[in-house]
């Protein structure tokens, strides 16, 4: 650790910011618990860049029924989240990405529990720490993203699991 402290952080990239305040920020490399990140700056997303062309080809191959299924999945999930008494949905309208929190439950623990059920979500403040935590005063959030890869059964499973809250 003492050796790592001798080096300046020269590159900053994705995943390197621990916290953001109105007039300051904390880099992971400056946090004694995350000192190793000084040597792991965020990298250009080369894999994603290369895959973009293939993704566009795939997107162009989709049928209208695929688009209809996605729209139905989004509306079904939105209606469920909006009407659940313990869920606070941030979205004002249906969208492929929806953010929410559950009153009285830690979002990170709920995210882990959903993962155990085969449901992948993101938790936290999604790179807008200061705005969400300090200005909006939200607890850490859960974010669900739906896409063409999600089946109607996926959404039904998610709703079944969240219904137990």
Predicted regions and their residues:
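Pyridoxal 5′-phosphate
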Residues: 1-165
């Amino acid at each position: 650790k003492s050796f790592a402290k001798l080096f300046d952080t020269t590159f900053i990239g994705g995943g390197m910011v621990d916290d953001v305040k109105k007039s300051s920020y904390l880099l992971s490399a400056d946090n004694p618990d995350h000192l190793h990140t000084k040597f792991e700056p965020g990298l250009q997303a080369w894999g994603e860049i290369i895959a973009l062309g293939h993704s566009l080809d795939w997107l162009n191959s989709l049928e209208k029924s695929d688009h209809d299924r996605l729209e139905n999945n989004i509306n079904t999930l939105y209606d469920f989240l909006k009407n659940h008494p313990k869920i606070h949905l941030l979205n004002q309208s249906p969208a492929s990405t929806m953010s929410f929190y559950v009153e009285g439950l830690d979002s990170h623990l709920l995210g882990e529990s959903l993962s155990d059920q085969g449901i992948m979500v993101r938790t936290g403040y999604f790179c807008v720490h200061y705005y969400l935590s300090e200005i909006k005063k939200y607890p850490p959030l859960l974010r669900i993203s739906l896409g063409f890869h999600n089946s109607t059964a996926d959404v039904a499973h998610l709703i079944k699991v969240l219904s137990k809250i």
